UniProtKB/Swiss-Prot annotation:
It comes from Escherichia coli (strain SMS-3-5 / SECEC). Homodimer. Interacts with SufE and the SufBCD complex composed of SufB, SufC and SufD. The interaction with SufE is required to mediate the direct transfer of the sulfur atom from the S-sulfanylcysteine. Its main location: cytoplasm. Keywords: Cytoplasm, Lyase, Pyridoxal phosphate, Transferase. The keyword Cytoplasm applies. The keyword Cytoplasm applies. Cysteine desulfurases mobilize the sulfur from L-cysteine to yield L-alanine, an essential step in sulfur metabolism for biosynthesis of a variety of sulfur-containing biomolecules. Component of the suf operon, which is activated and required under specific conditions such as oxidative stress and iron limitation. Acts as a potent selenocysteine lyase in vitro, that mobilizes selenium from L-selenocysteine. Selenocysteine lyase activity is however unsure in vivo. GO terms for cellular component: cytoplasm. This is Cysteine desulfurase. Pathway: Cofactor biosynthesis; iron-sulfur cluster biosynthesis. The gene is sufS.
Length: 406
């Protein structure tokens, strides 16, 4: 299938709107991606004609809704090449998925004197849950340091592992720098030391194929809203043997086998014992539509288009005076920058006046900001619906801001 950005853009209603009297150039998909009509329509159709509470209902609507929900679990398992759909837990997003692992697997397997390894480029969602776990149990949090070019000091990693290392929690792709970490060698090293590996895939799954069996990671988590799906839904993958051993971290309906006031409660099997309460079924249906949409386009086709666009953007940005770029030359999805000594918020506000949407701030990565000794950065993210013309508008906008502000 030939990739056509014009055809893709036609599927996204919001891309036809104007902002401040100018066509919208949406360069903030790393924060949250826009939704195609196919996703919007699938969720709306479910609420119009097929909504019911899932599980245990004997009536037709309930049975059909349950089947649709479980079919999305199967589709998601194929999307990341999991061995079984029963290795996938529906969560609200990447943040909840990581917290689930920290509170279930972590509470059961990390003890005083143990250690967990993360990196200096992590999103707060892959830092704070491990800080909280370490504080609860008396474990140590170890950190892989950054290089100035935005890659990790991987030569330091072997020295961080010892017999007390229980987990390596690492991002697949940095949400600020676009750095894609060499997961295969990192996972192999962790397993050689008897440690498990959690991968934060929030910034990876929309850019190229992910194969969790080939990676051999123990946990992989991502959000639907960055993958052109709805908010409030995500996927946590856990190797089946691990998942079956993990205790639930939330109690309620749907996750029990039996409940007795005198004899206590027993749990249903995984993954359902991690899905307490009424699920976000509409969001799950929308996620299924997003997975179908992206799969039909072909992730390899998307990757080729986006990489060409990224190379173009990096080359064109060289023409902007006093622009500082952060991150390696080979990157996925995002370009973080600052313009002279101007605060990122000011630059972002000017760009918004030109109809260009970028993200500004610390990007939930304060340790990374501290490493570069800046309070904030601007971040332009490139998705499959962005164009060379939008890149040109960004470059022209930055040149104009430089002339205005000096």
């Amino acid at each position: 299938m030939t990739f056509s950005v014009d055809k893709v853009r036609a599927d996204f209603p919001v891309l036809s709107r104007e902002v401040n009297g100018l066509p919208l150039a949406y360069l903030d998909s790393a924060a949250s991606a826009q939704k195609p009509s196919q996703v919007i329509d699938a969720e709306a159709e479910f609420y119009r004609h097929g909504y019911a509470a899932v599980h245990r209902g004997i009536h037709t609507l309930s049975a059909q809704a349950t089947e649709k929900m479980e079919n999305v679990r199967k589709r998601a398992s194929l999307f990341i090449n999991a061995r079984s759909a029963e290795e996938l837990v529906f969560v609200r997003g990447t943040t909840e998925g990581i917290n689930l692992v920290a509170n279930s697997w972590g509470n059961s397997n990390v003890r005083a004197g143990d250690n967990i390894i993360i990196s200096q480029m992590e999103h707060h969602a892959n830092i704070v849950p491990w800080q909280m776990l370490c504080a609860r149990v008396g474990a140590e949090l170890r950190v892989i340091p950054l290089n100035p070019d935005g890659t990790l000091q991987l030569e330091m990693l072997p020295n961080l592992f010892d017999e007390k290392t229980r987990l390596l929690a690492i991002t697949h792709v940095s949400n600020v720098l676009g750095t894609e970490n060499p997961l295969a060698e990192m996972i192999t090293l962790a397993h050689q030391h008897g440690a498990k590996v959690l991968v934060d895939g929030a910034q990876a799954v929309m850019h190229h194929p992910v194969d969790v069996q080939a990676l051999d990671c123990d946990f992989y988590v991502f959000s639907g809203h960055k993958l052109y799906g709805p908010t409030g839904i995500g996927i946590l993958y856990v190797k089946e043997a691990l998942l079956q051993e993990m205790p639930p971290w939330e109690g309620g309906g749907s996750m029990i086998a039996t409940v007795s006031l005198s004899e206590g409660t027993t749990w249903t099997k995984a993954p359902w014992r991690f899905e307490a309460g009424t699920p976000n079924t509409g969001g799950i249906i929308g996620l299924g539509a997003a997975l179908e949409y992206v799969s039909a386009l072909g992730l390899n086709n998307i990757a080729e288009y986006e990489q060409n666009l990224m190379h173009y953007a990096l080359s064109q940005l060289e023409s902007v005076p006093d622009l500082t770029l952060y991150g390696p030359q080979n990157r996925l999805g995002v370009i973080a920058f600052n313009l002279g000594k101007h605060h990122a918020y000011d630059v972002g506000s000017f760009l918004d006046n030109y109809g260009i949407a970028v993200r500004t701030g610390h990007h939930c990565a304060m340790p990374l900001m501290a490493y570069y000794n800046v309070p904030a950065m601007c971040r332009a993210s490139l998705a499959m619906y962005n164009t060379h013309e939008e890149v040109d508008r960004l470059v022209t906008g930055l040149q104009r801001i430089h002339r205005l502000l000096g």
